[in-house]
């Protein structure tokens, strides 16, 4: 008897990472941080680098042994190159990265052009850091101190790595080569769309890495200095809250710092549009510092801890909910392993909380803000305390609308990320599977504006299969 057609024609593709490997790195990260709490003689900068390395090194080793070649397509449709679209040139995602099986074939001339492209890129970034006053702030002092250690090592290792990678890349004429070709005056050979993608990828790293490293360094200092004997119930809440943020930042810093084909976590493509960049960078300093207090200030001095101070049991409930939501948020970052980065595509993640939602970090973070800020509660608190009901409704309405505006920013971020990642047929298959199996599938059936929008003309047949359930 022959088997009938499968009940679900689209399966969830495998993830670019393996969760147990990622959790191994997290366990080593936390263990290193705990050990360094007991060794105050270790400088804070050294402690920060050790904790980051404790996360990165186990992942690098385990992935090198277990996941080599994981980008080989598991489904015939995954090998179809993404069309030019917004990126500007065709990207064959099945041919990205290193060829581990073919013979090495480096070219000295190609290698030299790539080095010219590398040093040109770094010189431009150094110039930007020098002339932008924001980077002279004391916040970034740990980042500059880190570079004093990292730059000599980079100067030593990068030529050897570029020579090794050039001989093993499936597509050796990368962005570095095209930048070098442009500097050498080979305008007919330099591809402007590839130079643009190269510049955008480095802009992401140059913008986010200093900020995230500074935050990570600060969290390491706070973790090492925490005095457990002085913590009350709320103190323990914020300790675990900050521990979750520390793990999140550790994953983020490693993701931005290590972007190399050797680890298969290189950038496949970068968001090419202003409509994708603006809602992302507005959420970070210095832009949030300029706009947040003026237009999106939904918090007041009366957060959930203050408002519920007279109700300890309810305070515990809110603490558990908030920590649970932030746990999901951190879990989402851990799912990326070595591949975390805003505005870029570095491999499709389908495990961890991404097995249930395309945007678990955004959902959990935005929900946690509602529980933390309680922007609508002030009139009720003042009213039931006998302090009057009038005069508070306008403030509550304003705070609620401002938090809804922040939620809208993250909704736009989610939609533009989907648009960018849909350049990869593998992500299209994942998104269509999630449309049917994700925890938000009910919302997509009820409201078309939240439904996934795949590229037209490439997955219409699959979409019809999903709709019909055949």
Map each language-model feature to its residues.
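Membrane-anchoring alpha-helices and their flanking helix-loop junctions
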Residues: 2-343, 372-470
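Alpha-helical membrane-protein architecture signal
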Residues: 346-354, 363
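Short, conserved phosphate/pyrophosphate- and ester-handling motifs at nucleotide-, phospho-/glycolipid
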Residues: 359
């Amino acid at each position: 008897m022959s088997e009938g057609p499968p009940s679900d024609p689209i399966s969830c593709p495998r993830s670019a990472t393996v969760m147990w490997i990622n959790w191994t790195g997290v366990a080593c990260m936390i263990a290193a941080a705990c050990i360094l709490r007991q060794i105050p003689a270790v400088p804070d900068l050294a402690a920060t680098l050790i904790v980051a390395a404790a996360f990165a090194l186990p992942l690098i080793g385990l992935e090198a042994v277990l996941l080599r070649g994981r980008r080989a397509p598991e489904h015939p449709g995954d090998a179809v190159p993404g069309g030019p679209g917004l990126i500007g040139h065709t990207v064959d995602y099945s041919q990205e990265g290193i060829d581990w099986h073919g013979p090495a074939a480096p070219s000295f001339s190609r290698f030299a052009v790539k080095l010219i492209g590398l040093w040109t890129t770094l010189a431009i970034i150094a110039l930007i850091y020098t002339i932008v006053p924001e980077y002279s702030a004391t916040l970034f002092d740990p980042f500059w101190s880190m570079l004093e250690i990292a730059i000599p090592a980079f100067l030593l290792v990068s030529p050897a790595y570029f020579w090794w990678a050039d001989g093993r890349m499936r597509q050796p004429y990368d962005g570095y080569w095209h930048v070098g070709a442009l500097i050498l005056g080979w305008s007919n050979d330099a591809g402007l769309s590839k130079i643009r993608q190269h510049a955008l990828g480095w802009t992401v790293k140059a913008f986010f890495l200093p900020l995230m490293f500074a935050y990570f360094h600060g969290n390491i200092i706070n973790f090492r200095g925490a005095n457990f004997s002085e913590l009350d119930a709320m103190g323990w809440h914020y300790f675990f809250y900050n521990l979750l943020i520390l793990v999140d930042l550790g994953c983020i810093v490693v993701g931005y710092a290590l972007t190399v084909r050797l680890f298969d976590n290189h950038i496949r493509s970068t968001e090419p549009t202003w409509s994708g960049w603006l809602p992302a960078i507005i959420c970070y300093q210095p832009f949030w510092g300029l706009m947040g207090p003026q237009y999106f200030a939904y918090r007041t001095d009366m957060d959930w801890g203050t408002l519920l101070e007279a109700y300890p049991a309810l305070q515990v409930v809110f603490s558990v909910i908030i920590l649970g939501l932030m746990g999901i948020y951190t879990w989402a970052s851990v799912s990326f392993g070595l591949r975390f980065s805003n505005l870029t595509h570095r491999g499709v993640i389908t495990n961890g909380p991404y097995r249930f939602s395309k945007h678990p970090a955004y959902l959990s973070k935005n929900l946690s803000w509602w529980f933390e800020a309680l922007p609508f509660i002030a009139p009720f608190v003042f009213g039931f305390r006998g302090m009057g009901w009038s005069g508070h409704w306008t403030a509550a309405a304003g705070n609620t609308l401002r938090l809804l505006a922040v939620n809208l920013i993250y909704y736009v971020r989610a939609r533009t990320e989907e648009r960018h990642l849909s350049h990869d047929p593998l992500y299209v298959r994942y998104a269509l599977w999630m449309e049917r199996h994700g925890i938000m599938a009910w919302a997509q059936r009820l409201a078309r504006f939240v439904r996934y929008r795949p590229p037209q003309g490439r997955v219409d047949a699959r979409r019809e299969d999903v709709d019909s359930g055949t």
